[in-house]
Amino acid sequence: MASRMSMYSMASEALGGGPQAAQVSTTTLLNAIHNIYLSSQPYQLDASTSLVVNTWLTAAQAGATVDATLAARAWEHARRRAEDGCVILGSLHQSTPSLLVPFLNTFPFAIPASIYKSLEALQPFLRCVTPYNASAPRQIALGVTLTLSLGGNVTGASLALSQGGIDTENGLLNIPAEAGYRAFDVFYYLLTSASTPAEREFLGLKSPSAYALLARSGTYEPPSYLITADDGAAADDFRQALKEIGIKGSAHRNFISTLAGLLKLGNTLDYDADSDDFEEICEDVSGLLGMEPEVLMQQLSTEDRRTLVGGLYEALVDWVISKANSAIAAQMLRIRDGDESIDGRGVRTPTSNEDGDTVSITVVEVPEPSIGRALAMRTIFDDTIGINAEMIEDGVEVHPVGSSVVREMQQAVSDVAPDLGIMTGPQGRDRQHDLEKREVILEKVAYGSEDDSFVKKLLFPVEGEGVSLGRAGRFDLPALLSASRTWFHLSLHPTDDSPANLATLPAITSAWSAGTVSRQLRSWRLPEWANRRNRNLDYTADFDVDEFVGRYGALGCKDGKDGIETWMLERGWSNGEVFIGKERIWVREGPWWEAETMLDIKPAHSLQSMGQNPFTSGFDTSYSANPPNGSGFFPPPAMDNSLNGSNDQLMHTRNFSQGNMSQVTLNQHQNLNPQSAPSIAPSAMRNVQTTGDYGLGTKGDTYKGQVYYNEDGEFTGILDGELAKNKKIESKPLPFGRRAWIAFVWALTFWIPSPLLKFIGRMRRPDVRMAWREKFVLFFLIILINGMVVFWIIGFGKLLCPNANKAWNVKEVATHAEDEKSFWVAIHGKVYDITDFWQQQHSDTSIKVTKQNMLPLSGMVMDNYFMPPLNRACRGLGIKETTQLTFNDTITNPLAQHTSGFYTRDRTSALHDPDWYWKKFQPKIKEYYHGNLVWKKSKVKNEGENEQHMWATYGNEVYDLTDYLHTLDVNDNFDSYKFLNEDMVDLWKNSPGTNIKKDLDLLIANAKNETVSANLKNSWQCIQNIAYKGILDFRDSARCQVNNYLLLAFAIIICIVTAVKFLAALQFGSKRRPSPQDKFVICQVPVYTEGEDSLRKALDSLTALQYDNKRKLICVICDGVVVGQGNDRPTPKIVLDILGVDPKVDPPALPFKSVGSSSEQLNYGKVYSGLYEFEGNVVPYIVVVKVGKESEQSKAKPGNRGKRDSQILLMSFLNRVHHRAPMSPLELEMFHQVNNIIGVDPELYEYLLMVDADTCVEEDSLNRLVAACAHNAKIAGICGETALENDEKTWWTMIQVYEYFISHHLAKAFESLFGSVTCLPGCFTMYRLRSVDKGKPLIISDAVIKDYSVCDVDTLHKKNLLSLGEDRYLTTLMTKYFPEMSYKFIPDAQCKTAAPESWSVLLSQRRRWINSTIHNLVELMQLKELCGFCCFSMRFVVFIDLCGTIILPSTCVYIGYLIYILATGSGPIPYISLAMIGAVYGLQALIFILKRQWQHIGWMIIYILAFPIYSFILPLYSFWNQDNFSWGNTRIVIGEKGNKQVVAVDDEGFDPRSIPLQRWDDYALANNLPGRRGGYQEKTDYSYGDNYELDEIKSVYSAGPQGSVLTGMPGRNTYMPPQSPAFNNGRASTMGFQDSPMQHRQSMMSMGTGVHDMRSQSPYQDYPGQHPSVSNLRGQANLSPATGGGHSRSGTALGFSSGARSPMPDAMRSQSSFDFQHGHAGPNDMAIVESIRSVLCEVDLDTVTKKQVRALVEQRLQTELVGERRTFMDRQIDHELENM
């Protein structure tokens, strides 16, 4: 808890108030400076300026002199006034040491260690050695921004250079050619011995004298008068600092390569450089920088290279600063999470108050005296700008500045104008020209660099934005001063002597030169400064009148200026100390601190008893502490123990948190405010969770090692064995489908006895045993189907066509030609694989077996190479041993011809044996038999008939007599060669190519005598021995082809579906950016056991959505008070802490109906609401925490009913809102919070965005989803792409990346073509609440809610539908009841979610997904209306998906089989299967190649490697674990027989009367609340378009005055009608909160938006004198918290909001009513038309563009038109132009 006493109040004294009596002269000031120099003390020139004197000697030995009081004063103003501060560390002499680090050390809070490390790493880039300063900074300005919580602690920090950059001219490119000067220290550190030998060799480093940039002065060593002067030691420290800010590894290599490249490139800057050396240097430098040498040599001149060196060096420094800021942010995150202390050592306890409203203090070091002088003199003496101008305008009497001072000030500013961002004069134009030239050169170099080079990343830090050097990551120094409370800390130097001389002096304060010091005082006009400030302008705080009274009313200050003046006199303050201006109160430091001290010592209870708290009025939304209710819309309750009151009310809340004491709570203490409303629900549970933070119990508040779960994360409870004993027995009818299924299950599992399951399987309950039987049957059927599929694909074809894998035709044998590893040959109709034989030396002659001899034979038909002797092959035909056939084909390899018998060449060879062929060859070759050589029947017939190929078939065998007949032709039919029976030969001659079996058999059977018969038989035997060629190809038969054609048909179908999915995924063109939408959206986030990091990311992403903040509502529903694994407290407490709700808030627990069995339908919940701020976006939120009944509080998960119940809670609420039906007490409280507190009627919300708590939504996603729905009124549900946030975390996440991508871009894109996405994921889906045309409820319809809220989930099918796949089932129900609507997927809307990182979690997730998918697809198959017809319908696609999910294991088995076939070569290559697989993955690869998602190439490879996991392990595990549920004990199904289901009920049941229902109108009337709505029948004129009839709703968007937290919200695209009323029309809120000090000027820093003056910044208010500007039109919502300030002075280019104040008193301002019909949608059509006509009359139509016209029209209307308004404006512009 923050201390109420201030650090400042105890550590310092405030200055005396009032003008000082004596004038300050140069002499008196000089004397004072000498005194403080001797005593090492600071001197206060005025309340915001301190002077100190320092030398390097005093800084090194005694420590630098700095003013800690000034630091404390700046800190107090920042946190108390909620205003940004800026401390300028100015130097009046070139020899003063840097005070940046010493000054940071004086702040009264701890500075993170990473800031000092970052500065240590950065300083060598900015510091140089000069003769007058051993460490002279060369930057224009360096700022350290400290972001503080309003408790005063650091919550963030960053470093930045000013836009003026670095003086590289004097620090690098052109250092003075005098002894004592060096370039930036970093180059000497690079060249020291600290660099490793490997680095020196790689970089080619030499001594400093070898580099032209360093050699100009001849000075290479640091000054010797410094006792710590050692570049080597400094380099070691520097390298360590770099490592600690994250510059290590490849980043460090790139960094030193760039530095070395710059050094070497400096040697090319001389115009007379040697050409050979020049080319060598350019080659070397280009290698270091990653670019082509031609860029340096040919495309850049010498002057261009000079510019490149300076620009690239600045870009490198910017990169180092960005790395430093990342390291600081990482440490701040660890500090916030409690993982580290602020000094970087150890851990600490995280505090819950550091994530809220913030302010910033920026400490800016301006080392150059001329620049500091110009800044200071302009701030003090220029009365036309800044705070001086505001004071004068408000009536502060200021004496004019002397003309000489003005001229001197103007000359000082003119001398350094470009460094101050003033580009109007000659110097400015020259600077602008140089910057533009630098940008062109750097852009040329960047484009000439390699795509992944470090230089390109330096020059293009943000992809697609080009060179941003000097802008990105820099701050605008004048703009910073104009938007902050400025403090000056000026450092003088006592002498002009060189630093070396100081070391010889007797004392460290001996050096003194009055002339030197006097020159510094007079140069900066410090005497005039002191006199002017102390006489007129020394006011350090200013207030609005109401703001002043609100803050100090507790001290007796009365209303109005008269009351302030009276109180001022009572305090004894003169008009000079507190000045009452026209509109503001100006206070000097002394009186301000006196008043603040009185507030500090004032008891908190006395402040409360006065009816107000100064910490809740005027400043309560900025830095002060809110009362326990935290809202400011309810009266502060008395400090009563029953309300967990505390006397210390300074717990800082965050983000406008509506800690929201609800109406119920207030009603319990109506004596606090008689106008507060009574309870919503008379049945509010009084005794539930009344202790602990947020009223949610003590769990998580004190950690005592409570154990709620076992190791498996399951609740440790005991089941009652006597299931039906003492229980109520119910029975209900069973539908026919269920009865049939039960009968089928028992028919298949009757053989499994129930006692076995009960005692061995430990399934004591009948419903659990029945679920197991159902699971067993389903698993059996799935395995059976998978087995049938595998058998059909692999085995059925072989069964129909045996030996199909043993048949090869000539072409297939020829594929093994020249193949060493698969040596196939065909010999006499047989195919042999002689791979293991051919390399053996199998010849017994001189012929050697070599590759040259053997490989040409591979793949050949070798019949003629192995011809047996005819006299042996054709016995009985009288053939001589000298007779042989003459082959029709030429023998190409004679060495391979195996001629045996008579014609053997080598008589010693085994071939000389006439029986070699049968005795040797055939037995050996049979060992390598592989199959039959086959011939297509058509080929045999065609060649026989058309080509006279003398072959024919005998049955299935092919015989060829070509060689025999050719031998006869060659030998003129010589008798000795005519050995075959001529009648038999005539069969071949007369019928070639035909089947001669019948004729041949008949010829042999009808032989005339035995001699002829013997001759015929011998001839036939001879033909079989010498003419056999193989068999006919049986694989072409119908029996063998039917299975292939069936498989091919299904393959074609699958390919067509895949191809259509592919075409559906092809969406070319750029990513269109839709115009901003203006529909109201609820962002629902169901929360269960998520951790703080994921919850914060999810909420931050929703808050940062690029969507009108007022039109989105974050609705967080916490499913029970549950402590998640890894958390130290319940999830609801984590959520409320993130949102910034005060832990003291304890709203009542209100009853509502939950989705549960029996008595679990009664549940209680608590409601919290407020505003959450992130990165300048302030969004309303509502949190519903389900806390459970009183009887549940002792259980581990009180209130937990599941995600489906969380969805139903909100859907049911919106359903009742739509129908204006009676609501439960919880729903009434939700309505009250949304309608009256947040200020938006719930019926205005048109869309429901469902986001999981571990999902981060991209910024433009919501606008894209809404735009898609706005353009297509038929869309009822829409989802975007879900990508992985942790894709590279573990192996298990890696295998999911590709699957996520393809599942969206193939499956969902295909289904979206039909408008029938079957699964809208619950992690990122948006539903339309009601139809556009008739306002018909959709997602909130009665039918959907009824089916989705089934309470009795007691069967396996229901469990898988409603407990595992609720999101998919919700989509199924929407498709069922609204088939005419569309359900779309748009890839442009994206989100990121965290995938399971471990095997166990992945297994659990996929079990749920796969089983729910199957059961949901079964439901989808039963729907009657699915688009399409027959096989072209979505029903067919759903069937394909269902089959695909079921047969996943068989798919894996088949792919394994294919791999086996290919690896072993044991069968023909399945080309079709391989082509299909290639097509599927090829098309998928083509998708991400066309979408330029190159990274998915790698992810696809990983996915394919993990395919067995996805297709085999996960499905089988899922199928077997379909019954793996937690079964409730309340309702137990003890039997399903006949047509009845018997249920045992073990509790008191649910009585609907326990939840009282009440219509909102009745409740509002009874409690005097605004917002009467009327009944549903009164909605006849209701329109969901732009014409709302909602005056009676009294929302902030309706005509009536209704207060809400949105009144002060900054919004985008908000129409601000001129002269609209102040908040609440100047009247008190109807909620009974009478004090409204925030009506006019209110500090809004907690929004982080720069909204400071509600008269100019309220979304609905504007006043005369407020002129629109581009920055106004752009809005303030995207400014970071650091850019806003409580008192921003004037608009700047950075977009700081204007602080101009209207001179009109409040009474003169118009008090008109805000018209909702036009206010929420901007101006009407007529106003737009008039504005267009006016603009077109004023502009030059020949040069103006339509975009410019649109901008001018919007500027004239003071709003940005969106949606339909923008479309109307575009049409009207075209129309007006046509008519001109």
Swiss-Prot record:
Record flagged with keyword Transferase: yes
Domain Cytochrome b5 heme-binding: 805-866
Feature: compositional bias, Polar residues: 1668-1681
SUPFAM superfamilies: Cytochrome b5-like heme/steroid binding domain, DEK C-terminal domain, Nucleotide-diphospho-sugar transferases, P-loop containing nucleoside triphosphate hydrolases
Residues linked to a glycan: 133, 153, 629, 644, 655, 660, 888, 1009, 1411, 1524
Induction statement: Expression is induced in the absence of chsv.
Disruption phenotype: Impairs the ability to infect and colonize tomato plants or to grow invasively on tomato fruit tissue. Leads to hypersensitivity to compounds that interfere with fungal cell wall assembly, produces lemon-like shaped conidia, and shows swollen balloon-like structures in hyphal subapical regions, thickened walls, aberrant septa, and intrahyphal hyphae.
Membrane topology type: Multi-pass membrane protein
Class of the enzyme per the UniProt entry, highest EC level: transferase
GO annotation terms (biological process): chitin biosynthetic process; fungal-type cell wall organization
Region called Disordered, residue ranges: 1649-1691
PROSITE patterns listed in its UniProt record: DEK_C
Catalyzed chemical reaction(s): [(1->4)-N-acetyl-beta-D-glucosaminyl](n) + UDP-N-acetyl-alpha-D-glucosamine = [(1->4)-N-acetyl-beta-D-glucosaminyl](n+1) + UDP + H(+)
Stretches that traverse the bilayer: 740-760, 776-796, 1046-1066, 1442-1462, 1469-1489, 1497-1517
UniProt entry keywords in alphabetical sequence: Cell membrane, Glycoprotein, Glycosyltransferase, Membrane, Motor protein, Myosin, Transferase, Transmembrane, Transmembrane helix
Subcellular location: Cell membrane
Protein task: Polymerizes chitin, a structural polymer of the cell wall and septum, by transferring the sugar moiety of UDP-GlcNAc to the non-reducing end of the growing chitin polymer. ChsV and chsVb do perform additive, but not redundant, functions in septum formation. Functions not only in the maintenance of cell wall integrity under different osmotic conditions but also in polarized cell wall synthesis. Plays an important role in the complex infection process of this fungus.
Family as reported in the entry's similarity comment: Belongs to the chitin synthase family. Class VII subfamily.
Entry comment, domain topic: The ChsVb myosin motor-like domain (MMD) is shorter than the MMD of class V chitin synthases and does not contain typical ATP-binding motifs.
UniProt name for this protein: Chitin synthase Vb
Lineage, uppermost ranks: Eukaryota, Fungi, Dikarya, Ascomycota, Pezizomycotina
Gene assigned in the entry: chsVb
